[in-house]
Design a protein with these regions (language model features):
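Active-site loop/oxyanion-hole signature of alpha/beta-hydrolase fold enzymes
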Residues: 8, 14-19, 26-42, 79-122, ...
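Active-site glycine-rich loops that stabilize anionic/oxyanionic intermediates
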Residues: 45, 53-56, 124
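The conserved beta1-alpha1 loop
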Residues: 49-53, 255
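Serine-hydrolase catalytic-loop signature spanning alpha/beta hydrolases and amidase-signature enzymes
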Residues: 55-63, 74
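Conserved hydrolase catalytic core segment
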Residues: 112, 116-160
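Helix-rich cap/lid subdomain of alpha/beta-hydrolase
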Residues: 157-216, 220-224, 229-234
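Conserved serine/cysteine hydrolase catalytic core
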Residues: 218-272, 281
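Catalytic active-site module of serine/aspartate enzymes centered on a nucleophile-bearing elbow/loop
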Residues: 276-307
Length: 307
């Protein structure tokens, strides 16, 4: 399980400015010299870029970063409206939190951190942002190269999603910030139900995740940001088709089968439509593989670095 203290994680990061907003970025590790690479490793790969999910943050990946950064450079950042990144209150979803804008942010972070050829890792809402980057890569429009795409539980195939009560309640609210914070308990209990029985979240983990949501009055924005679900529906041909037809780099799926939201039918459908997809199912894992089984995620990434 991820046991990295939130303060240590924040202290280890830095901020860049993008679109007049402050973006929290955590970069660690370094690219090894070519003579130090294991046999079969691609010397052109210069790092790992991780895109987190909703309502998570870069902290979700702290334990993975600690291990993978022993082998290469790892960059993970807080998306607009998440964690320690700016959370603008003026304007609605399309202006501030569109998945296309989040993908632009990912490109800006990669450029700022000097990434040119990466293993792209994505989860949950980040899965769809990753799909947009994969689309751009397939069409020669991405500013960096994808060496391998590792995709984890997410509901880009939104027609198959099983929304929980918290998500349904947030989607029923207007597309504007709330006047007051939502109760912490709403998030703690909503998150608790998305972990597996074998890797149940501790109170400490749930409180850290909720702290990241509540930072900068972020809970007030949840009804706005969650409209990414509706944007997925408006782009039902665009992003799922990318996952079905991605051709410009290898593509692996790692899926926790106890996920009550991003259900097994989703990874099965991607595998059915794209048989060459490297699919790994974990029966004992829920929605948060990077928190529940970081050692497995780390191994998957390191294996892709080494061959």
């Amino acid at each position: 399980m991820n046991e990295v203290p939130l303060k240590d994680w924040i202290d280890g990061g830095h901020y860049i400015e993008y679109d007049s907003q402050q973006i929290f970025v955590h970069t660690s590790g370094k690219v090894p010299n070519s003579q130090d690479l294991p046999p079969g490793a691609n010397p052109d790969v210069d790092g790992v870029l991780i895109i987190h999910g909703f309502p998570g943050s870069s902290w979700d990946w702290a334990a993975v970063v600690a291990e993978v950064s022993k082998h290469t450079r790892v960059v993970v950042f807080d998306l607009f409206g998440h964690g320690q990144t700016s959370k603008p209150m003026e304007g609605g979803f399309e202006e501030n939190y569109s998945l296309f804008k989040q993908a632009d942010l990912a490109e800006a972070v990669a450029k700022a951190e000097g990434l040119h050829n990466v293993i792209l890792v994505s989860h949950d809402m980040g899965q769809t942002i990753g799909a947009e980057l994969m689309y751009r890569h397939d069409h020669g429009k991405l500013s960096f190269k994808i060496h391998h795409a590792l995709v984890h539980n997410g509901s880009t195939l939104v027609n198959l999603v099983h929304l929980n009560d918290l998500q349904k309640n947030l989607l029923a609210m207007p597309d504007k910030p709330l006047d007051a914070d939502l109760p912490r308990e709403n998030f703690i209990e909503g998150l608790r139900g998305t972990f597996s029985k074998e890797h149940a979240a501790t109170d400490e983990i749930l409180n850290i995740m909720t702290d990241q949501i509540m930072a900068k009055n972020g809970s007030r924005l949840m009804p706005v940001i969650i409209r990414y679900m509706l944007q997925r529906k408006r782009n039902l041909e665009h992003w799922p088709t990318t996952l079905f037809e991605f051709k410009s780099a290898p593509f692996s799926l790692y899926w926790g089968l106890q996920d009550p939201v991003s259900v097994e039918d989703m990874c099965n459908k991607i595998k059915e439509e794209r048989p060459s997809t490297d699919l790994h199912k974990w029966p004992d894992v829920g929605h948060w593989p990077s928190i529940e089984v970081p050692e497995r995620i780390s191994k998957a990434i390191i294996d892709r670095l080494n061959g």
